[in-house]
């Protein structure tokens, strides 16, 4: 199936590793030219070189700290200066601190909201004027299923993700009229560095081994395993493509059936 992505310009935040890197690679494999954004310059350059070598398509690395409003605008401006425009924005950067509310500090909450929520807001605000002028665009927000099914041990990510989901649906209604489709993907557990940190924290909190915590996590998923970054990327690439041209305001759950939804 031709996804119609050849020649499209995509900006992927959090693109130096994990899900973001897999999404950028997936887009490049379909012929898109990708810009990737992250804070760490070395990891960013390495990721860009790796994707270029694997796909034969240009990847433009641009460093930025999306907790800073001026950085989000600068990143978008740099991508437009380099490629001419942006067709696709994939908001992926940021992970909120986990833990129960009594263990979270004000700083933890600030981190959760500044990167996981306000980072999405800032990048979206920066690209929207350009997409409005072209009357076309795709915004894919990679969020997390605890925004719909909150967890006590993940209270700050749950809150930030819920805010991202609300923004997705609200903006889809507002900007769909202008040819801009805005959708969300809610992954469950995904095998990334972030998951390794999270499962380690769960193991310590429950006073069990990491192997046992991993086993229990896998058992909670009907498919019996953790999702891969590439599986999230496959969905994101499709949602960003012309083949999903009537998808707008959708929230796609990608958790292997882990969380019940129908009346619970």
Where are these regions (language model features)?
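Substrate-binding pocket helix/loop in short-chain dehydrogenase/reductase
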Residues: 100-101, 108-113, 139, 217
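Active-site helix of classical SDR
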Residues: 124, 160-161, 168
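Short, small/polar-rich loop/turn modules that mediate ligand/substrate recognition or access, typified
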Residues: 176, 181, 247-249
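Short C-terminal tail/terminal secondary-structure segment
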Residues: 149, 237, 248-264
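Alpha-helical segment proximal to the catalytic Tyr-Lys
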Residues: 129, 173-174
């Amino acid at each position: 199936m031709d996804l119609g992505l050849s020649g499209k310009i995509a900006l992927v935040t959090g693109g130096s590793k994990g899900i973001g890197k897999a999404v950028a690679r997936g887009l490049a494999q379909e012929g898109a030219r990708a810009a990737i954004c992250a804070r760490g310059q070395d990891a960013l350059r390495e990721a860009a070189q790796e994707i270029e070598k694997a796909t034969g398509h240009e990847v433009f690395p641009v460093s930025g700290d999306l907790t800073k409003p001026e950085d989000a605008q600068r990143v978008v401006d740099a991508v437009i200066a380099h490629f001419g425009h942006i067709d696709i924005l994939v908001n992926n950067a940021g992970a909120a601190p986990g833990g129960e509310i009594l263990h979270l500090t004000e700083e933890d909450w600030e981190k959760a909201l500044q990167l996981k929520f306000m980072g999405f807001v800032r990048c979206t605000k920066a690209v929207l004027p350009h997409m409005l002028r072209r009357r076309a665009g795709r915004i894919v927000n990679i969020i997390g299923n605890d925004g719909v099914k909150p967890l006590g041990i993940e209270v700050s990510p749950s809150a930030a993700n819920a805010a991202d989901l609300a923004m997705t649906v609200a903006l889809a209604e507002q900007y769909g009229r202008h040819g801009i489709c805005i959708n969300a993907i809610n992954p469950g557990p995904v095998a990334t560095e972030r998951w390794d940190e999270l499962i380690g924290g769960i193991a310590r909190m429950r006073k069990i081994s990491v192997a046992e915590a991993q086993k229990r996590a896998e058992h909670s998923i009907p498919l019996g395993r953790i999702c891969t970054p590439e599986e999230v990327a496959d969905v994101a690439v499709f949602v960003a493509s012309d083949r999903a041209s009537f998808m707008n305001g959708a929230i796609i759950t990608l958790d292997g059936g882990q969380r019940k939804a129908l009346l619970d």
